[in-house]
């Protein structure tokens, strides 16, 4: 069933009236009735006229309706577009706001990070400054301690020097002389020592020698009026000795038995042994004063001054000029036959290039 509205109903009525009028016109033509002017009546014409007017009215209403509908649709479309545009604007604004918030957050984070870095840098600098100050304080303390220790050492050295000076000031070096008289003539050997006083010490008095050797309270250098600085200069040349040729001294292959010499006058075990020193037969007063005894024999020849002193004469030393005894006239190299020389080595006819057995002395260092 089709849907009918005013327009379709009016259109159906128009078609119906028009069909009746056409059928009346056909009947007129077929019957050929002279009294029938029109094929349809006036009522039918009026009905058809009304229907046509109604149809046109419906079309006008339909046009208005369609126009209004178009306007409404356009309005809805515009409203939709405006709403869409508003939504887009809102979304854009919201997006911009979110971006701005993100940017603010990033700026805040960067600011906080920068502040944190600055704070850390500040703390680091403070820590470095504290460490630097601490190190400076420690360095000052160390220097202060070193200065105090140095001052203490200096005061100790000054005190030691003052003690030594006071000790040496108490000694008498002006009257040290040596009595070279033979025991057969005068019967005594007078030795004036600064440590023993200016009085004579008789050699005839029996004084047993100890096992440790002679009395160490009488330094021989001080007896001749020599100080520490003067006596040290006598042996300074030993520091310049070249010992590179004795390369085996540091090893275990150095044979020291070849250097044993018969120093009977200086190292006679029989004469210098403790029993003989304590033996009355060898240490009695007659033995000590016997001019024929080798122990008490004294050579009165002064090699440095080229003088021969007789028995009973006294060799005096000038204490104001200690170097007079140790002048150029003293032959320090004449050591007698008890010392080996280069000629003694050459007389041995040793093949210096031949290598010995393992552990022996390497003779290549002694090539002459």
Curated annotation (Swiss-Prot):
Skewed-composition ranges (Polar residues): 177-192
Return the Low complexity bias intervals: 265-290
S-S bridge residues: none
| Record keywords, A-Z | Activator, Nucleus, Transcription, Transcription regulation
Q: Which GO terms describe its cellular component?
A: core mediator complex; cytosol; mediator complex
Known InterPro entries for this protein?
Answer: Mediator_Med2_fun
Gene Ontology molecular function: RNA polymerase II-specific DNA-binding transcription factor binding; transcription coactivator activity
Report biased composition (Basic and acidic residues) as residue ranges.
112-163
In the record, biological process GO terms are:
negative regulation of transcription by RNA polymerase II; positive regulation of transcription elongation by RNA polymerase II; positive regulation of transcription initiation by RNA polymerase II; response to endoplasmic reticulum stress; RNA polymerase II preinitiation complex assembly
* Function (record text): Component of the Mediator complex, a coactivator involved in the regulated transcription of nearly all RNA polymerase II-dependent genes. Mediator functions as a bridge to convey information from gene-specific regulatory proteins to the basal RNA polymerase II transcription machinery. Mediator is recruited to promoters by direct interactions with regulatory proteins and serves as a scaffold for the assembly of a functional preinitiation complex with RNA polymerase II and the general transcription factors.
| Name this protein carries in UniProt | Mediator of RNA polymerase II transcription subunit 2
């Amino acid at each position: 069933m089709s849907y009918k509205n005013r327009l379709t109903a009016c259109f159906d009525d128009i078609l119906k009236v028009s069909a009746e009028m056409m059928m009346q016109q056909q009947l007129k033509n077929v019957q050929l009735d002279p009294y029938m002017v029109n094929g349809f009546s006036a009522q039918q014409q009026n009905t058809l006229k009304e229907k046509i007017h109604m149809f046109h009215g419906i079309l006008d209403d339909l046009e208005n309706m369609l126009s209004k509908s178009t306007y409404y649709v356009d309005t809805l479309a515009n409203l939709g577009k405006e709403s869409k545009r508003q939504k887009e604007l809102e979304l854009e604004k919201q997006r911009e706001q979110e971006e701005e918030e993100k940017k603010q957050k990033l700026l805040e984070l960067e600011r906080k990070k920068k502040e944190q870095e600055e704070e850390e840098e500040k703390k680091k600098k403070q820590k470095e400054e504290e460490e630097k100050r601490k190190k400076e304080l420690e360095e000052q303390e160390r220097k202060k301690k070193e200065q105090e220790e140095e001052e203490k050492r200096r005061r100790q050295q000054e005190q030691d020097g003052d003690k030594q000076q006071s000790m040496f000031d108490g000694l008498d070096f002006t009257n040290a002389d040596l009595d070279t008289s033979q025991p057969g003539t005068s019967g005594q050997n007078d030795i004036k020592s600064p440590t023993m006083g200016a009085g004579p010490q008789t050699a005839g008095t029996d004084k047993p020698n100890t096992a440790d050797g002679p009395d160490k309270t009488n330094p021989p250098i001080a007896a001749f009026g020599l100080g520490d600085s003067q006596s040290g200069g006598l042996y300074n040349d030993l520091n310049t000795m070249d010992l590179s040729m004795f390369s085996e001294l540091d090893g275990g292959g150095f044979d020291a038995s070849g250097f044993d010499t018969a120093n009977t006058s200086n190292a006679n075990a029989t004469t210098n042994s403790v029993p003989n020193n304590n033996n009355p037969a060898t240490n009695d007063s007659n033995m000590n004063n016997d001019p024929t005894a080798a122990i008490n024999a004294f050579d009165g020849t002064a090699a440095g001054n080229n003088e021969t002193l007789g028995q009973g004469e006294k060799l005096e030393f000038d204490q104001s000029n200690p170097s007079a005894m140790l002048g150029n006239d003293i032959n320090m190299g004449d050591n007698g036959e008890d010392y080996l020389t280069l000629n003694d080595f050459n007389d041995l006819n040793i093949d210096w290039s031949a290598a010995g057995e393992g552990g022996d002395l390497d003779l290549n260092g002694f090539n002459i």
